[in-house]
Structures are given as C-alpha cells and as structure tokens.
Amino acid sequence: MIAAAERYLETRNGTIQYLDVGTGIPTLYFHGTGAGNDAALLLEQPLLKSNCRLIIPNRPGYYSTTLGRRGSANFCADLAAELLSHLMITRAVVIGTSGGGMPAACFAKCYPHLTASLVLQCAQSHRWDEGKWLPQGLGHALLLFRHRIFTFLLRWQNARHAKASQRQPITCLRHMSGRRFPEIYDDLNAAQQIAELANLTLICSAAPAGIQNDWAIMVGDNGVTQNSIRCPTLIIHDRADPLVPFLHAEWSQSCIIGSHLLGIHAGGHLIWFGKDFEFMNTERIAFIRKSFPA
C-alpha cells in the first residue's frame, strides 16, 4: 500500500489537514462520511497506481480540519480551493465519494475554473427532504436528522454501530454491501480493507464533529441543482447501494447536462469490490485521462 504523512495548512478560514500523495494528474478528493482521508487513501490505491496525484483534505470537523460553518458545503469547497492555491494547482479532477458528493458538487459549481471534470461515486447529491433519499431502512428517521435536539441519540447510535463493526468487521461489510453481501463476503481483499476501515470509523465516531457536520449538510444543503455544474461529469453508482439510494445518481444525471451515469454491479456502497470493480476502474481512469490530457 502506498502511504503518506498528514500535512497541515493554516488559512484565513482555519486549519486544513490533508494528504498529498502520488504523481500525475492532480485529483482533489472529497472523502465520505464516517471516516477521514485515511479511509480514502486505503480504498483508492488503484487511482495512485494509475498516475493520479491524490490531494485528500480532511473535510470540516474530521480530525484536525476546522469545523467552520456548520452544515455548509460551501465552507468545505472554500477550504479545498485554498488548498489548491497553496499547492499551486490551477486545475484538477474532482472526486466526491458518498457523503463527499455534495461538497464536491459545490466545489465544481463554485470553482468551475479549477475543475477539469467531476466524478461522483456512490455519492449523496440530493438533500434529505424525504425519506426516500436516506439509507435503506432509515427513511422513518428523517425527523431525527432535522432537529439538533436528537443529535446525541444519533451520535450514540453511530458510536454503537462503529464499535460493533470494529469487533466484527463482517458486520460492517454486510451493512455497506447490502444484497451484494453474498457475492463478496469471501473476498479476502475486501475483508482486509473493511477491517481497517472499521478501525478508522471507530476513531471518527469518538470525535464526531465531522460526522455531525455531514448530517447537517445532508438535511440543509441544496446538493446538486439543475444546470449548476457544466464540467464533464461521470456518475458511478451500484444500483443496489444500500446506503446512498440509486435515486441520487439519477438525480445527478438529470441535473448535470452531458453527464454519464455508469450503473454498476459491484459491492453495494463498496464500489471498490465485486463483479464490476475492474470495469468501473477502467472506465473511471479513461474518463479522468480524457478530461485531463497530458
């Protein structure tokens, strides 16, 4: 595994903790909910091996990155723009994964001159204004996410789940893969990476400012809106994703003119495993290279 040390940047908006690893196409990566940039580095080794330079800031509230304006995808995008300026990068491919989808889309909307292309993978894109946008089986809990008085309850449940997943990583694998679980439960690579992911998730659950900020974004941010993004866009989503319903991918495609939706059969929310992983990664790399020619 290609590893890297955390770096820190002090800006007018606060501290950014980030990873800058690899050489090649500059790729600004917005990690998912529940774990920080270390989880993205764990899962995205294929990008590093395909000549991508991964720049992965911890999003607001995760580890040492400043929380800033609660529930603001714009604040996250602004921090990322400051990071690119510091690194003297004038254009980058932007990737948003899972809960990082809304901040990535916000970056592409607010900083089109910095965005060569956008990849939304298993990504949240629509505000949680109806139960259908929430993870499978959680639609009835929308009220809890809308009112801060219930935050302690959500935080407790998240920590409880993280502890269970760390004790038995197979629980985490089942939760994230949904009905794809029978297809990947005996995948040794998946088992090893999910065990490590469960450890990272447990760490973040103990200091949940970033997770709580993500919940606020999901219920309060506009997400992807009609015709707000103009760059080449690839949307990658497993049709059986149990955590981010496929509706999010269809919504993104309907809003972003000329976008391409790659509906895959992978590992549910875990697009890095399963039947279509190699196909997905080949298509993803081809898209990135086309949008950022040498």
Task: Walk through the language-model features, giving the residues of each.
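Conserved HGGG/HGGXW glycine-rich cap/lid loop of the alpha/beta-hydrolase fold
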Residues: 14-66
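Conserved acidic catalytic loop of the alpha/beta-hydrolase fold
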Residues: 75-93
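Conserved hydrolase catalytic core segment
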Residues: 91-134
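Flexible "cap/lid" loop of the alpha/beta hydrolase fold
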Residues: 118-157
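Alpha/beta-hydrolase
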Residues: 145, 149-224
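Short beta-strand/loop motif that positions the catalytic acidic residue
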Residues: 229, 235-237, 241
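Conserved alpha/beta-hydrolase "acid-adjacent" motif
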Residues: 242-248
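Catalytic active-site module of serine/aspartate enzymes centered on a nucleophile-bearing elbow/loop
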Residues: 258-294
